[in-house]
Design a protein with these regions (language model features):
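ABC transporter nucleotide-binding domains
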Residues: 1-143
């Protein structure tokens, strides 16, 4: 028997454009007519060459930039039409991990050290952080 229920996307990006005015005569089309869906439970990677618009797409998707045109829907609602309360709730649910090529990975640190660092910064003891990291690494098959 076929499942006829249509799955609704959690995130929909529709015809997203973000242009930057470089001068009165020149416009940089950082993102030009991008459309895609993300469904609950999916892991999505946006990959491409340096300068192709990956970070601009992410920044626009979480409202750090206003789009030139297009829409971003989260759970069926246009994020650019959120009221104050909806915006606060949205900020609790989404985040962007900014890329920094100069601090990406420290070759002197193990995966355990890197993952545990954030836990310790939030007040977790070294013993508890180590145990949590071991559990997480085992969960994803990196033990």
């Amino acid at each position: 028997m076929e499942n006829t229920e249509k799955k609704q996307p959690l995130v929909q990006v529709k015809n997203l454009c973000k242009y930057f005015e470089i001068s009165r005569k020149e416009t940089l089309k950082a993102v030009d007519d991008l459309t895609f869906d993300i469904y609950k439970g999916e892991t999505v990677s946006l990959v491409g060459e340096s300068g192709c618009g990956k970070s601009t797409t992410g920044r626009t998707m979480i409202k750090l930039y206003n789009p030139t045109s297009g829409n971003v829907y989260y759970d069926g609602k246009d994020i650019f039409k959120y009221n104050h309360a909806e915006q606060k709730e949205f900020c609790k649910k989404v985040q962007m991990i900014f890329q920094n090529p100069y601090s990406s990975l420290n070759p002197r640190m193990t995966v355990k050290d890197i993952v545990g660092e954030g836990l310790k910064q939030h007040g977790m003891s070294t013993k508890d952080a180590d145990a949590k990291v071991e559990q997480l690494l085992a969960t994803v098959g990196l033990n």
